[in-house]
Each structure stands twice: as C-alpha cells, then as structure tokens.
A protein has these predicted regions:
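Helical "lid/coupling" subdomains associated with nucleotide-phosphate turnover
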Residues: 1-202
C-alpha cells in the first residue's frame, strides 16, 4: 500500500512544537507488508485476527478468515467469486488503508514537564488536507470505494494520528493519475481538465 502526500504538514493548532527531521513537501511511503495478496497475512497480523473480524461480515469466523488469507497469499491471482469473499477482500483493504495512513501521517503527543503540559508534533499534520484520491485494483473494482477510503481519515478514537479530517474523496478508476501528473509539468490546464473529467467523487 503506497501513500503519497503533497503538503507542508505544519501544525494546524497553536502551541504545538515540531520535533524530528523535516518532512518533505512531497512525501511517499511504501508499506510492503500491507497488501491484498502476498502480504495479506501481514495485514491480519498487524491488527490481530480478532480485531480483523470487525472489518468482515459477522458470519465469518477467525478460522475461515485465516484460511482465506492464507489461500490468497499463495494464489495471488485469485479473484473472489462470491459476495462474502469480496467482503473479506474489502475488509483487508480497509485495514491496509487505515494502517498505511497511520504510518504516513504525523502524530501529536502531550509531554508533561515542570511547567505543565506541552504538545509535540512528529511528522506531517495532514488534518486540513482537503482531498484524498484512491487508486488501485481493489478500489477500482469495489462496489463502495468510498467506504474503504474513509478508513484512512481522522479517527476521534485515535486523536494523536494526524490524518485528514474532512477530505473530499475521489477515485482514479482508470489508473490515469500518474499520466495527469506527468502532463501537469508541460500542460497544467489540460492536466486539470483531465483530472476533473476522470477523477470521480465517492
């Protein structure tokens, strides 16, 4: 699961101190252990099998989940042939999205010292990011790609994770995003027109 962000990522709230190495304006992270086939077992391992059950249909038990994940990691060309198996795939995608975003964005911590509490930011604050674009096989073929992408936005249960709060969610169903990026270097107006035509709200 690859995540790219284009933003300064400076603190969006007052009284926050930034620590650590300076983050690049254009940042890319590649999570090789968070994938839909070879590394699907790593996705389940990262969150735990019991927690993973919260992202798949209720009738699926832990044993069935693990058996399916083992199957698709061995048979990487496998395509789900029924609704239940598709829902397991979507569950894996939701968790991979959630974890990959969590690793990509910054975090904020409360530090207590002799003068009271202070807030420290590590990494990029992307809470104000206004757009999130999804691309890739599982998103392009999902019945509800927006539901998968929403697992990458800010979660009030994990307020320390500085993920986008209310981004507009778009889908690159035709794998055209990289072409738009290249075109923008020589014809930005045409690239924008292409983006508006092919990137769909979800």
């Amino acid at each position: 699961t690859d995540i790219d962000s284009i933003a300064k990522g400076a603190p969006t709230k007052g009284g926050v101190t930034v620590r650590g190495l300076e983050e690049p304006y254009v940042k890319r992270t590649v999570e090789g252990d968070l994938g839909m086939r070879y590394s699907a077992p790593s996705v389940v391992e990262a969150i735990g099998p019991k927690n993973m059950l919260n992202y798949v249909p209720k009738e699926i038990g832990e044993k069935e989940l693990i058996n399916y994940v083992d199957k698709i990691s061995d048979d990487v060309k496998y395509v789900p042939n029924n609704k239940k198996k598709k829902q397991i795939d979507y569950g894996i995608a939701k968790v991979a999205t959630k974890l990959a975003i969590k690793r990509h964005v910054g975090r904020i911590e409360t530090v207590y010292g002799p003068f009271g509490a202070s807030h420290v930011q590590y990494g990029k604050d992307l809470t104000k990011l206004d757009m999130m674009i999804g691309t890739g096989g599982v998103l392009a073929h999902s019945d509800n790609p927006g539901e998968i992408l929403r697992h990458g936005i800010y979660d009030s249960n994990s307020p320390e994770v500085l993920a986008p709060v209310e981004p507009e969610l778009l889908l690159d169903k035709e794998y055209i995003l990289s072409c738009i990026g290249l075109l923008s270097e020589i014809a930005p107006d045409k690239a924008l027109t292409l983006a508006k035509k092919h990137l769909k709200k979800v």
